[in-house]
């Protein structure tokens, strides 16, 4: 029987145009897309997670910082929570190498009633939710 992992995540980031070469929204889209193509995948045996780039409609050519978000959605066959989390963290690090990540959050769960939720807040906690028992446990207290 196959095991499934499901991921839902959003990353907000900023692209800083140090050379002030971005003069149009189209140029910004090209710069972001060129770096976007270099990002690693979050994989499953049937299909990979879908990754979407969302650019703010507002464009001001006098600014040097341009904010955008990346959304990730996937139903990943033959993956564990741990494997998906590792690939997500690799993806996040690569995003941060091209841009400046300002915030991120994710929910990763499986079909065995385990859910991992993270939001980058002041507390910086990862929480495991055991949906079957309605118990909350910290990540370091539970083996996944």
Language model segments and positions:
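Charged interaction segments
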Residues: 24-144
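Short, extreme N-terminal segment that most often corresponds to the first beta-strand
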Residues: 1-33
């Amino acid at each position: 029987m196959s095991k499934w992992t499901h991921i839902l995540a959003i990353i907000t980031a900023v692209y800083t145009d140090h050379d002030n070469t971005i003069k149009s929204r189209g140029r910004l889209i090209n710069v972001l897309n060129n770096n976007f193509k270099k990002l690693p995948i979050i994989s499953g045996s049937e299909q990979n997670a879908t990754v979407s780039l969302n650019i703010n409609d507002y464009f001001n050519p006098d600014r040097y910082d341009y904010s955008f978000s990346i959304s990730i959605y996937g139903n990943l066959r033959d993956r564990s929570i741990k494997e998906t989390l590792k690939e997500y963290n690799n993806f996040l690090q690569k995003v941060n190498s091209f841009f400046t990540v300002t915030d991120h959050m994710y929910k990763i769960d499986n079909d065995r009633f385990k859910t991992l939720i993270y939001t980058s807040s002041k507390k910086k906690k990862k929480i495991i939710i055991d949906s079957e028992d309605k118990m909350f446990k910290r990540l370091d207290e539970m083996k996944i």
